């Protein structure tokens, strides 16, 4: 979905909304974090609670290890380092996952979030596979890329990302009916030329509007 369409396409249900933005980028001053901040600013303008989970700043370990496997098999409790993150995810009404595209997919840190945090017994039920703690939430995947959205769509990469992340992972397994993928595209890394900066600022304005629109939708 185009950013402008996403802003106008949002509807809402009516109480205090909790928006959690989750980022994967080692640079604190990156465009990734600027996008997350813009989204939260928009959400807070509609009186929502907006918080940031920077996976790098939190010291998150993305590597799926033996403890994770033992928990998956039902032989051990959830690893201690996941408890607070899962609590924050469970309490959120809206999850915004913000990350740059690396080799046509999410970075390793964000993949580790999927592997370890959205696990069996939390995101879906052991045995039955039924959705659990994410069911009914709103999810927005915001992907940053130097390419254009039109290229992602024409190449088939967009369809693959939507199928894998929005439809299969969040829709089928996690019970999230409202999951969408949005692009902050045509970015030029490390370039301070006025035209490029203006284009980036324009995208941030749209992201701020998106954050507000998502909250308004849930408040209707």
Predicted regions and their residues:
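Short, glycine-/small-residue-rich phosphate/pyrophosphate-handling segment
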Residues: 125-173
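A structural motif corresponding to the C-terminal end of an alpha-helix
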Residues: 91-92, 98, 137, 169-178
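Short, well-ordered coil/turn elements that cap or connect secondary structure elements
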Residues: 14, 45-47, 134, 173-176
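Glycine-rich phosphate/pyrophosphate-binding loop and the adjoining helix
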Residues: 156-220
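N-terminal beta1-alpha1-beta2 submodule of the flavodoxin-like/Rossmannoid cofactor-binding fold
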Residues: 2-122, 126, 194-197, 201-220
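Hydrophobic/aromatic beta-strand patches that form the interior of the parallel beta-sheet core
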Residues: 20-22, 51-53, 140-143, 180-182
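A short beta-to-alpha transition loop/helix N-cap that caps and shapes the active-site region
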Residues: 59-63, 148-150, 189-191
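A short small-residue
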Residues: 16-20, 144-147, 184-193
